[in-house]
Amino acid sequence: MSDLKAIQTRSLEMAEYFVAFCKKHDLLCYLCGGGAIGALRNKGFIPWDDDLDFFMPRKDYEKLAELWPQFADESYFLSKSHKDYVDRNLFITIRDKETTCIKPYQKDLYLPHGLALDVLPLDYYPKNPTERKKQVRWALIYSLFCAQTIPEKHGALMKWGSTILLGMTPKSLRYRIWKKAEKEMTKYGPADSDGITELCSGPGYMKKKYPIQAFEDNIFLPFAGTQMPIPVGYDAYLSTAFGDYMTPPPADKQVPHHDALIVDMDKSYTEYKGEYGA
C-alpha cells in the first residue's frame, strides 16, 4: 500500500469515528474543503488528497472540546491550545496516537504527533460593516497569539508586524490577549448577522461570506464505501470558497498540500522519539 493510500485509509477510519461520535452526542459536523469536493466529484477522496477536514458551528465545536476527553476512545487525542498548552494550530485537531505524522512546525513540541483530522469552527458574519472590520481585526490578533508563530506566507508586512507584536508581548500576557480576541470575534449571533465565515482558517478564508442557510444542516453522501456529511448548502459554500469546484485543477496542481518530516501509519509517534525535535 502506498503512503498516500495508507494515509487516506487511516484518515477515513478517523473520520468515521468522529462522525459517529458527533451523531451520538447530537453535534453538527460536515466535511469541508477537499473532502466535501471529493464526496461530490469522486464519491471519495480527491485522488491526491492526504487528509479530511471538518467544519462545525461554533457552539457544537466548543461542546466537542468538552465531550471528547470524557467519552472518546483514548487512542484519539483532541488537541486544542490553552493557557498551558500551545500546539501552534488555530483550531482543534484529533490525533491518532497509534500513528506518526510529524509536521515541521510542531517538531519541537511535546504532543501526540499522530495523523491529524482538522476540525474548524464556523462563526457568524455581522451585518454591520464596522462590526465586521472589528471582527476581522480581532481574528487576526487571535491568529497571532493563539498560534504564537510568525506567519511566513502572508507577506513581508504581516511577518514584520507579527514579529514585533509577539516579541513585545510577554508569554504571561499572550493567553489573555488571545482569549479576549476570541471572545470579541465570536460574540455575534444570528440576530445581528447575515452570513457565516471562517475565522480560524487563515487570512484568505476570513474574507469569505457564506449564506447562513448553507450550514443549517448536513446531508450524507457516499464516500469511499461509507457515508460522510457535507453542508446542506454545499454549492453556495463551495462556489464561494473555490469557484468551479467540479472541475479538477491542472495536472501540476494535483499534488498533496501537506508536508511532514516522518509519516508512518503502522507505528506510534512514540517509537520515533529522538528522531525529531521534541
Predicted regions and their residues:
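Conserved SAM-binding loop
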Residues: L64-E66
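A short secondary-structure junction signal
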Residues: P129-K134
